[in-house]
A protein has these predicted regions:
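Class I SAM-dependent methyltransferase SAM/SAH-binding core
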Residues: 98-155
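Short, glycine-/aromatic-enriched active-site segment of Class I SAM-dependent methyltransferases
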Residues: 200-223
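Short alpha-helix
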Residues: 224-240
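A short acidic, Gly/Pro-enriched loop at the edge of an enzyme's catalytic core
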Residues: 154-165
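N-terminal auxiliary segments of SAM/dcSAM-dependent transferases
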Residues: 2-53
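Class I SAM-dependent transferase core
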Residues: 41-88
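Conserved Class I S-adenosyl-L-methionine
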Residues: 245-311
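A short glycine-rich, Lys/Arg-flanked "PGG" loop and its adjoining helix->strand segment in the class I
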Residues: 179-194
Length: 311
């Protein structure tokens, strides 16, 4: 189902006024922020440091919006999203996988246990996440199959034709740029190899304008990455990929996030909140009119693409 990108004018201007007020009240801070370079690693380091359970393997450290079609808990929904991406990637025994932007590697642990992936190499630019993820992998006894290191998805430190599969679970919108990542992914995949990406982007019809630029900056999203699903597919084609598929899962992500942020604002831990879209579904528009506007994305898709096989 195609999403409609425009929101009611009164909501649009309410949101714009909220940004304008920030510039009026804190002009020096806001201008300085907009002039800074992208600090994705700093953003996620600060988020991690606020978590009291960071070193406790009994508390999963998922960092995605989740797939809430049947799940009602945050950790369950995040695991469901990882499983959905595994389906799209067609992960199986024998695969040698590169996972970029792996967060705390929860999905890598799941894919080894449930999909029996032979080996996973993970790249992540946030050093604290790499350190904690290595610790969690070691405690799980899987350090021989999951190797994690600091590294960039736009400058992958491996030779061409190195991997059967390549995954990016809800991180590619941060890459500077996503197109550079596409080029690198194509290079390091073996002929016939498969790329699978869970990604957030503007809905079809949303204006790519000044307001989106400001919100993108606040979310550490390089503005060249802000394009809709149709342009996304064209860019994959441009970099040589074939058999491209795009599966929208917005209806099972964003409505749940309306509830998520409402409960978090009440002081409920993400490990304790309960969301049941079967009983209370606010719909996609509830997200797009509010947080989706400020967070600079309101479409969610799973993309898959293949590097052509050799003749």
């Amino acid at each position: 189902m195609e999403n409609i990108g425009k929101i009611p004018l009164k909501d649009e201007w309410r949101n714009r006024w909220a940004i304008i007020k920030q510039f009026i009240l804190n002009p020096v801070r806001e201008m300085a922020f907009l002039q800074d370079q992208f600090q994705v690693s700093e953003l996620y380091t600060n988020i991690a440091k606020r978590d009291p359970h960071l070193h406790d393997p009994n508390f999963p450290q998922w960092l995605n919006f989740g797939y809430w079609k049947e799940e009602t808990t945050y950790n369950g929904a995040c695991a469901a999203l990882a499983r959905k991406l595994a389906e799209v990637a067609e992960l199986k025994a024998g695969d040698h996988l590169l996972d970029v932007g792996f967060g705390f590697a929860e999905q890598d642990l799941l894919w080894v246990r449930e999909n029996n992936v032979s080996s996973i190499i993970g790249l992540n630019t946030t050093e604290l996440q790499v350190e904690i993820a290595q610790e969690r992998v070691a405690k799980a006894g899987l350090s021989d199959r999951i190797k994690l290191q600091v590294g960039s998805a736009t400058q992958i430190p491996f030779p061409e034709n190195s991997f059967d599969k390549l995954t990016a679970l809800e991180c590619a919108f941060h890459f500077d740029t996503r197109e550079d990542f596409f080029a690198e992914a194509f290079r390091v995949l073996q002929p016939g190899g498969r790329l699978a990406v869970a990604d957030c982007l503007p809905r079809v019809g949303r204006e790519i304008n000044f307001w989106l630029r400001v919100n993108s900056k606040k979310m550490c999203i390089p503005f060249p990455n802000q394009y809709d699903r149709h342009t996304y597919v064209e860019k994959l084609k441009k970099h040589g990929f074939v058999n491209i598929q795009a599966l929208s899962i917005s209806e099972y992500v964003w409505p749940a996030m309306v509830h998520y942020f409402a409960q978090i604002s009440q002081g409920i831990s993400k490990h304790d909140l309960v969301i049941d879209l079967q009983k209370d579904n606010p719909g996609l528009e509830a997200w797009s009119r509010n947080r989706g506007w400020f967070m600079a994305f309101d479409d969610y898709l799973l993309f898959s693409a293949e590097k052509p096989k050799l003749n």
